[in-house]
Amino acid sequence: MKLLQLPPTRAIFCALALAALPALSQETRYCPSFLGVKGAPEPTHRGELTFSPYTYHWSQNPQHKQVVLLAIDEQLPGNRLCGVSFFSNSFGQPSIYAYVGQQFNNLMGRPQLFAKVTAGIMYGYVAPYENKVPLNYHGINPAVIPSVGYKLSPHDSVQVKFLGTAALMFSYGRQF
């Protein structure tokens, strides 16, 4: 009998994210304290685990592969965050994105609607695809990713991430 079979890169991503969950439930802060807003109240949730099963590419390319992402954020005072995401990029290469960000709640006066922007360093677009992202040097490049989300409940949300001129990523987030 075959149980759940994942490609090795996806299995590694899942294992890393699951291994990080117990650590994030502790009171220790993993993000540098200077990233939070001094004097702002502590966030109501410790962190967020995000999963993206689907990415829509603007241009159809036979080289494109399915993109799967697993990310974990630590929430900081002042609606700031830092985190790391593990994903298979558009060409099937294992990739990582370490980032800091800001979340803007109550977008357009709607409590469920929010926007988020993250900025950081990405690694993973290596030969022969190093020219597929701007400012790439040996697989390392800066990245800025804006997104819009909708809170389904106090813990659950869906988000759309705008990946430059390349794609839209659809994801589900669970705060803990």
Task: Enumerate the predicted regions with their spans.
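Transmembrane beta-strands of outer-membrane beta-barrel proteins
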Residues: H45-F51, R80-C82, L113-V117, V158-V160, ...
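Outer-membrane beta-barrel "beta-signal"
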Residues: P53-T55, A166-F176
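Transmembrane beta-barrel domains of outer membrane proteins
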Residues: D73, G101-N105, G149-K151, G173-Q175
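Residues that define the transmembrane beta-barrel architecture of outer-membrane proteins
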Residues: H45, H64-L70, G78, G92-A98, ...
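Cleavable N-terminal export/targeting peptides
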Residues: M1-E42
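Outer-membrane beta-barrel translocator/channel fold
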Residues: Q63, K116-A143
